[in-house]
A protein has these predicted regions:
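Generic surface-pattern signal
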Residues: 14, 83, 125-128, 149, ...
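Short loop or secondary-structure boundary microenvironments that flank
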Residues: 21-24, 105, 109, 212
Length: 276
């Protein structure tokens, strides 16, 4: 596995590599070996975990490594959904660390007044927490799941985040990024994140398309924080005139022309429904 990942890194030469679920810490011995080798290549790493086991002590101060702990809401909801990675276990396993907390906002949360603030009040005072991020639940097209936010709930979630970031500085999300949750990309072809990333499954061969959600994501309901962040950058206009998105798209087109790479077609049905 280690050699395979390093081969992929050498082939694609990414600026950033995310290692995500299941849970990378299932292979914690390989992670302890692999992460320094990737960092030596100048690649920033983001490792997403449930923190079901203790994090290596050295990870608390490794430059270029961001450990993200996924939390599914407040303790009652999270513990029911994430056993054995309960709040109690997470708090024990992140002691002495320096982690990012990530939570995906669902409709159930928005139906409970003050839910997001209570979440921040629990996590942000802790020394181990350097920042908190919120995503919004992203469905596949045609889904009718209880977690899907209504349009009014999405607007309220954005308003809440904009307000909460003023009172909770560890909610490390720029206002323009938060606002992008109201105008997500219409398709993978117009999503800067989808266009600039490559997602590879655990077999180190299978590509997950059209983005990390796989299958047929409902882009109009996208709540991906990475997509929102890159769209906020892409929408910025240099000199107030030229949107950065034009530079992104031109660079991508040139890169594909030089490499001979073609963008894979969007699948007709969900094949890799991963990661929320």
């Amino acid at each position: 596995m280690i050699d395979g990942v390093l081969e992929i890194v050498d082939k694609h030469r990414p600026l950033h590599l995310s290692i995500v679920g299941g849970d990378p810490l299932v292979r914690y011995r390989e992670m302890e070996t692999l992460i320094p080798l990737i960092l030596e290549k100048g690649v920033h790493i983001q490792l997403v975990t449930s923190a079901f086991r203790p994090l290596p002590e050295a990870w608390a101060s490794v430059p270029g490594l961001n450990v993200v702990v996924s939390i599914d809401g407040l303790q009652p909801e999270h513990d029911e959904r994430r056993k054995p990675a309960t709040y109690e276990r997470i708090l024990t396993n992140i002691q002495g660390q320096n982690v990012t907390i990530h939570c995906t906002i669902t409709s159930q949360m928005m139906r409970s007044d003050g839910y997001l603030e209570r979440f921040l009040q629990f996590w942000t005072p802790r020394n181990e927490i350097k920042r908190v991020w919120f995503s919004i639940f992203t469905p596949q097209r045609g889904d009718s799941m209880e977690e899907i936010l209504t349009p009014s709930e999405r607007k309220q979630a954005v308003a809440d985040m904009l307000s909460l970031r003023e009172r909770h500085p560890k909610l490390d999300m720029h206002p323009k990024m938060i606002a992008e949750y109201l105008t997500p990309p219409e398709s993978p072809e117009s999503c800067v994140f989808s266009m600039t990333t490559k997602t590879i499954s655990a077999d180190l061969t299978t590509l997950i398309t059209p983005c990390q959600f796989g299958g047929d994501p409902d882009c109009g309901s996208c709540g991906c924080i990475a997509s929102a962040g890159l769209k906020a950058i892409a929408d910025h206009k240099l000199g107030g005139m030229v949107p950065i998105s034009a530079i992104f798209k031109a660079s991508i087109a040139i890169g594909r022309l030089v490499s001979g790479e073609e963008r894979p077609p969007v699948p007709q049905k969900a094949e890799f429904p991963i990661l929320r």
